[in-house]
UniProtKB/Swiss-Prot annotation:
Main location as per UniProt: cytoplasm
Enzyme class of the recorded protein, top EC level: oxidoreductase
List of residues binding Fe cation 2: E170, E233, E267, H270
Motif (Cy) on chain: 49-51
Family the UniProt entry places it in: Belongs to the ribonucleoside diphosphate reductase small chain family.
Matching CDD domains: RNRR2
Cofactor: Fe cation
Sorted UniProt keywords: Cytoplasm, Deoxyribonucleotide synthesis, Iron, Metal-binding, Nucleus, Oxidoreductase, Phosphoprotein, Ubl conjugation
Protein's UniProt name: Ribonucleoside-diphosphate reductase subunit M2
Positions of post-translational Phosphoserine modification: S20
């Protein structure tokens, strides 16, 4: 049975920095473990019966944290085990859209990439391998949050369906990136280095630590953490996606760039879903707090792609990349219902039809002509070809 985590008051970024994100992920605080009575001195059987009576009658308890009870997404929902009748049609539509976009790593042809890979300059190979290392680790971190926090907190069935499917897709993304590394990198020591990027690469570790800190933060509200992980999938991924699309513009690495199309479409939908969940919240973080989270993510991503792993290695302009990350952040702010922060234009014309909004041409055009037939039409037929 899933349990409801009770968000407490928010904490400052300075306090967050003092928490070791890896040590903060504890399994010891699961609420579905019954409270221990070992510390209660049971002096008589009458007292013992009274204690057990109190445990058996939770309805008599008065909630000390009304914020959870005030949130339709988070409060106890006895109907969470069944899907119908649909109550949140917009959330359900998002789930069906994700379901219709299902794909697997085996469908991506990497046979032509090896020849391209060997023809790349050393700087280009260095950049691509390190970006893939970040991606391979980051999807696992997103799943850690979905499993440990969001899926346990949210009590709305439609949202749980989406989170469950998102977990499956993040696994496929992680498999795809691992397969790309395994295909391109022949040296076993270099592969091991890339697969352990969170420990071996400081620039990747910095981004991972920021995300892990939000997972382990027991005091941040659900709303703050939704914004933080919208930033992870909408901002932390955006520049790296753009850099791979830059390779596509140059006609390079068809397998890598096709998988990038599929994954960026998925992440755009995940980011849109986070914004939808945010809109359903009754108690939202203030615009100032949201700006603080978003600008922090922007600074980390700009540093990653212009200093730690500069896009100039593949011939891109670092200044324009900084601007693109700010453009993506502004778009996310608008989607969350707030004002733009940076007020800049999209500097990359090749990214005009490739955004992380989810309202892109990806889904409508059926990227790579791939979409599960009939899923979005709500129709059932027995005359399909098998």
């Amino acid at each position: 049975m899933f349990s409801v985590r009770v968000p407490l008051a928010t904490i400052t970024d300075q306090q967050q920095l003092q928490v070791s994100p890896l040590k903060a992920l504890s399994l010891a605080d699961k609420e579905n473990t019954p409270p221990s009575l070992s510390a209660t001195p049971v002096l008589a059987s009458k007292v013992a019966r009274r204690i057990l009576q109190d445990v058996a009658e939770p309805e008599s308890k008065v909630s000390t944290n009304p914020s959870v009870e005030d949130e339709p997404l988070l409060r106890e929902n006895p109907r969470r085990f069944v899907v119908f009748p649909i109550e949140y049609h917009d959330i359900w539509k998002m789930y069906k859209k994700a379901e219709a976009s299902f794909w697997t790593a085996e469908e991506v042809d990497l046979s032509k990439d090896i020849q391209h890979w060997e023809a790349l300059k050393p700087d280009e190979r260095h950049f691509i391998s390190h970006v893939l290392a970040f991606f391979a680790a980051s999807d696992g971190i997103v799943n850690e949050n979905l499993v440990e926090r969001f899926s346990q907190e949210v009590q709305v069935t439609e949202a749980r369906c989406f989170y469950g499917f998102q977990i499956a897709m993040e696994n496929i993304h992680s498999e795809m990136y691992s397969l790309l590394i395994d295909t391109y990198i022949k040296d076993s020591k270099e592969r091991e280095y890339l697969f352990n990027a969170i420990e071996t690469m400081p620039c990747v570790k910095k981004k991972a630590d920021w995300a892990l800190r939000w997972i382990g933060d027991k005091e941040a509200t659900y709303g703050e953490r939704v914004v933080a992980f919208a930033a992870v999938e909408g901002i932390f991924f955006s520049g790296s996606f753009a850099s791979i699309f830059w390779l596509k513009k140059r006609g390079l690495m068809p397998g890598l760039t096709f998988s990038n199309e599929l994954i960026s479409r998925d992440e755009g939908l995940h980011c849109d879903f986070a914004c939808l969940m945010f809109k359903h919240l009754v108690h939202k973080p203030s615009e100032q707090r949201v700006q603080e989270i978003i600008t922090n993510a922007v600074r980390i991503e700009q540093e990653f792609l212009t200093e730690a792993l500069p896009v100039k290695l593949i011939g891109m302009n670092c200044t324009l990349m900084k601007q693109y990350i700010e453009f993506v952040a502004d778009r996310l702010m608008l989607e969350l219902g707030f004002n733009k922060i940076f007020k800049v234009e999209n500097p990359f014309d090749f990214m005009e039809n490739i955004s992380l909004e989810g309202k892109t041409n990806f889904f409508e055009k059926r990227v790579g002509e791939y979409q599960r037939m009939g899923v979005m039409s709500n129709s059932f037929t027995l005359d399909a070809d098998f």
